[in-house]
Amino acid sequence: MKYPKQIRTYCPFCKRHTIHKVEKVKKRPRSELSAGQRRFRRKLKGYTGFPRPNPAGREKPVKKLDLRFRCTVCGKAHTRGQGFRVKKFELVEV
């Protein structure tokens, strides 16, 4: 899917329609020191199996896109609804 790099949309911070830059957010590595991750690692120790139901077969083939719209006037970014599923995504100049 081709999506424009700049789009004119409503800015909830300026409270008016302005030009926004569209940016695709990259997934960051998960923190190994978070409380949930430490609990999970403790659970994996020993002679046990996987502590949760196996997600194979239930997971979706494609993740949802995380798009941020950054206002060129105030510089703040916001999302617009939920993401959508798409295999190929490309930002293009219009």
Curated annotation (Swiss-Prot):
InterPro entries: Ribosomal_eL44 (IPR000552), Ribosomal_LSU_eL42 (IPR053708), Ribosomal_zn-bd (IPR011332). GO terms for molecular function: large ribosomal subunit rRNA binding; structural constituent of ribosome; zinc ion binding. A zinc finger (C4-type) spans 11-74. The keyword Transmembrane helix does not apply. Pfam families: Ribosomal_L44. One of its GO terms (biological process) is translation. Keywords: Metal-binding, Ribonucleoprotein, Ribosomal protein, RNA-binding, rRNA-binding, Zinc, Zinc-finger. One of its GO terms (cellular component) is cytosolic large ribosomal subunit. Belongs to the eukaryotic ribosomal protein eL42 family. Binds to the 23S rRNA. Part of the 50S ribosomal subunit. This is Large ribosomal subunit protein eL42.
